[in-house]
């Protein structure tokens, strides 16, 4: 099993943060490695929405990493499941209101099967690198609030 999480405090209202995160089209603004993203099916920004995404893989290859929003609780939680690609983690953004803004926790969980289980250390490292990008979200939203 591989698990990674990271959290930041963003000086913005929980609904502002939620509205930005629920829109999959915003991912390239704060997550590196996303080559393309589009809404594949379902209503945008809601439970059931499926986003077609390609990301940078090893050796410069482009890898499918489509995902579906599996839970959407406005101002509180967004969960998703990766549905394409070799590794298919589930994850979520968990928001809580604090006096100084919104605390956001980004968590990823992956249960490797078969031979992928032998690569657990590499998968764990890659997942940690993904969740730490939450620091970039904080910067992006700070700039947006100043504009």
Task: Tell what function each PLM region has.
Residues 38-84, 132-147:
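Glycine-rich portal/gate segments that line the openings of hydrophobic small-molecule binding cavities
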